[in-house]
Amino acid sequence: MMKVLVVVALLVTLISYSSSEGIDDLEADELLSLMADEQTRKECIPKHHECTSNKHGCCRGNFFKYKCQCTTVVTQDGEQTERCFCGTPPHHKAAELVVGFGKKIFG
């Protein structure tokens, strides 16, 4: 009976040690992820700025991430080029308006 208790205690100790190592690894990975998110936030493209070269790099607005909206521009020479900027799509503007109105009514 004593041998069984020693083996169980040893197993519990090993399991708790391995799980604490896993938690430490998870915390380190989470910290790296948070640092990467902060770096991305610093490098994101603000609203109304050009995003032609990086169409997925727009920053987040109050509720939604800005979308890269593109238009075709025709120069005086007749040459067509695509120009893009970060902005809020109409359906996101409507949702923000409804949420803002709801906050004013319901506090």
UniProtKB/Swiss-Prot annotation:
Subcellular location: Secreted
InterPro entries reported in the protein's UniProt record: Spider_toxin_CSTX_knottin (IPR019553), Spider_toxin_CSTX_Knottin_CS (IPR011142)
Coiled-coil boundaries: none
Family note: Belongs to the neurotoxin 19 (CSTX) family. 04 (U1-Lctx) subfamily.
GO CC terms: extracellular region
Swiss-Prot/TrEMBL keywords: Disulfide bond, Knottin, Secreted, Signal, Toxin
Entry keyword Protease: no
Propiece span(s): 21-41
One term of GO molecular function: toxin activity
Protein name: U1-lycotoxin-Ls1b
Signal peptide, first to last residue: 1-20
Domain remarks: The presence of a 'disulfide through disulfide knot' structurally defines this protein as a knottin.
Tissue: Expressed by the venom gland.
Keyword Secreted part of the UniProt annotation: yes
Disulfides per UniProt: C44-C59, C51-C68, C58-C86, C70-C84
